[in-house]
């Protein structure tokens, strides 16, 4: 084959020697999912771009900079999926799987983001995910934690991984933090890069994701969310 035909940057092959390990990991995870009552669902690699704009957020780096989007022959904007949750939810709604019923579903497959390839981060990467719908209360969240712990244990990862649990607080707490954070950032508006200025009017909290050095310096003294969250 002509040497100029190579895999695209950040999109790697999996040869037979690596595939056996890959299949072992998948099978163990799928077995654990099944033991907790989760069923597999499959959905397309390509979805309407608007689906991800709505679910992930128009002002996020994923939507603005990282998605592989293009127009099809009908002029519709479509995108390779950058994550699995949006497609899973869309499939459930479209197929009537959420009407007056609970669902436990899992999926796996390639996702795509045009990031800078580096160790542990590729432009085509594989995601295994589990979603639960229609369960009231926090019990299902606890079950997810137990399921994750079981996966780590079966793959001998418990000693090398740490689980950190985050919270964005209640709606009132979050709104109060957004107001305080926005007031703080506005004091430095003239020092913000163009992306951050845009986010200031559309979704101020996205500024926290900025990799701009100057913005990072401003954020160093910004109010932090945990100060506005009251856990009981």
PLM region descriptions:
Residues 1-231:
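TRNA-recognition modules of translation machinery and tRNA-sensing kinases, especially anticodon-binding
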């Amino acid at each position: 084959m002509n040497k100029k035909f190579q895999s695209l940057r950040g999109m790697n092959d999996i040869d037979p020697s690596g595939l056996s390990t890959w299949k072992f990991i998948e099978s163990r995870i799928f077995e654990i999912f099944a033991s907790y009552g989760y069923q597999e669902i499959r959905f397309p690699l390509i979805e309407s771009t608007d689906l991800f704009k709505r679910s992930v957020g128009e002002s996020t780096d994923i939507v603005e900079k990282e998605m592989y989007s293009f127009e099809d022959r009908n002029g519709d904007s479509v995108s390779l999926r950058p994550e699995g949750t949006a497609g899973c939810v869309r499939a459930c709604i479209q197929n009537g799987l959420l009407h007056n019923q609970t669902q436990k579903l899992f999926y796996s497959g390639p996702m795509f983001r045009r990031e800078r390839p580096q160790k542990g981060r590729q432009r085509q990467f594989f995601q295994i995910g589990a979603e639960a719908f229609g369960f009231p209360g926090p019990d299902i969240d606890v079950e997810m934690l137990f399921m994750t712990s079981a996966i780590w244990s079966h793959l001998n990862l418990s000693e090398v991984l740490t689980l950190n649990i985050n919270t964005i607080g209640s709606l009132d707490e979050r709104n109060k933090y957004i107001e305080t954070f926005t007031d703080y950032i506005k004091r430095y508006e003239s020092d913000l890069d163009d992306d951050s200025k845009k986010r200031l009017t559309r979704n101020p909290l996205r500024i926290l994701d900025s990799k701009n050095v100057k913005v990072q310096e401003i954020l160093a003294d910004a109010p932090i969310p945990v100060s506005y969250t009251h856990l009981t």
